[in-house]
Curated annotation (Swiss-Prot):
Stated name of the protein: Epoxide hydrolase B
Subunit structure: Homodimer.
Organism of this sequence: Mycobacterium tuberculosis (strain CDC 1551 / Oshkosh)
Signal peptide, first to last residue: none
Enzyme active site: D104 (nucleophile), H333 (proton acceptor)
């Protein structure tokens, strides 16, 4: 087994893919979809494990990232376009069906692919972000897109505060703060919402007498690092490690830094710009179940898992073939990187139970 870099033509969009497979080049296809601010490299621990278990594995750079196509027009980053890229990957490999696994922004793309194209989806796994219907990202009070995102974000953030997704959608402020120190910004964000960073923040809150157990979920969000005072920078709330964690090395940080030095953030941030557009585009799907076999993997300290608690609790209502929720202890947002062995075990158990 050896990893091969390929450029796929997915309905006119260039998609960079890193592929691996068993020696006989056979086996079910598994497509891996990364989130923000990441890369195919986010799946570096899963690619060999899945290929070694007999699957053809394809980890892509989503459009706007890495060596994949970049578009100036923001509407090119609507979720239906991202789902179209996944369909194009299957077509490039001549696959009628594939298993699709997504983390962070990759999870809504994976879920929506399964929702819109159930005949092409052998099974779907969302990591960190549960299925949220037309809402794309589940939040307390609007787990399945009951509210238009931009309206709800204002209420969620509260007076004088800004929800990070809206800050990202505007782009100017976030790009300015990133470009001041790209490498430092990536390290700060990564560590702040990791298990170590979130555990430290939780301990500090408890030591200060905060009763987190009794707090309203919205108050927890407002007190977190991704809800900002107006005029503040996101990185003002970052915490940094004294030494690099074992799961995220200097070499890993160098890789991500190099990718974004070349690609920039215009495309990735446009995913956030389109959240309202996605809500409108998926209106005709409202109330329709997601029918392929589905699994969710969350982290104890993961912000996406915490925000999506209502969507997770009610997953069986909207996914009749839901195979369960698995929570990994002591990890934060970067679940498959922080806990690769446990993630691989859960993926292989799920895929193995569905394999022809």
């Amino acid at each position: 087994m050896s990893q091969v870099h390929r450029i796929l033509n997915c309905r006119g969009t260039r998609i960079h893919a890193v592929a691996d497979s068993p020696p006989d080049q056979q086996g079910p296809l598994v497509v891996l979809l990364h989130g923000f601010p990441e890369s195919w490299y986010s799946w570096r621990h899963q690619i060999p494990a899945l290929a070694g278990a007999g699957y053809r594995v394809v980890a892509i750079d989503q459009r706007g990232y890495g060596r994949s196509s970049k578009y100036r027009v923001q509407k090119a980053y609507r979720i239906k376009e991202l789902v179209g890229d996944v369909v194009g990957v299957l077509d490039s490999y001549g696959a009628e069906q594939a298993f699709v696994v997504g983390h962070d922004w990759g999870a809504p793309v994976a879920w929506t692919f399964a929702w819109l194209h159930p005949d092409r989806c052998a099974g779907v796994v969302g990591i960190s972000v549960p299925f949220a219907g037309r809402g794309v990202i589940g939040l307390p009070g609007s787990p399945f897109g009951e509210r238009r995102p931009s309206d709800y974000h204002l209420e969620l953030a509260g007076p004088g505060r800004v929800w990070y997704q809206d800050y990202f959608a505007v782009q100017d402020g976030i790009i300015t703060e990133i470009e001041e120190d790209l490498r430092g910004w990536l390290l700060g964000l990564t560590y702040t919402v990791s298990g170590e960073g979130m555990m430290a923040a939780t301990k500090a809150a408890v030591d200060a007498g905060v009763d987190l157990e009794s707090m309203d979920p919205i108050d927890v969000i407002r007190a977190g690092p991704l809800c900002m005072a107006e005029g503040a920078r996101l990185k003002d709330a970052f915490v940094y490690p004294e030494t690099m964690p074992a799961w995220f090395t200097e070499a890993d940080l160098d890789f991500y830094t190099g990718e974004f030095e070349r690609s920039g953030f215009g495309g990735p941030l446009s995913f956030y710009h389109n959240i309202d557009n996605d809500w409108h585009d998926l209106a005709d799907q409202q109330g329709k179940p997601l029918t392929p076999p589905a699994l969710f993997i969350g982290g104890q300290y993961d912000v996406g898992t915490i925000w999506g608690a209502q969507a997770i609790e009610r997953a069986h209502e909207v996914m009749p073939n839901y195979r369960g929720t698995h929570m990994i202890a002591d990890v934060g947002h970067w679940i498959q990187q922080e806990a690769p062995e446990e993630t691989n075990r859960l993926l292989l158990d799920f895929l193995g139970g569905l394999r022809p």
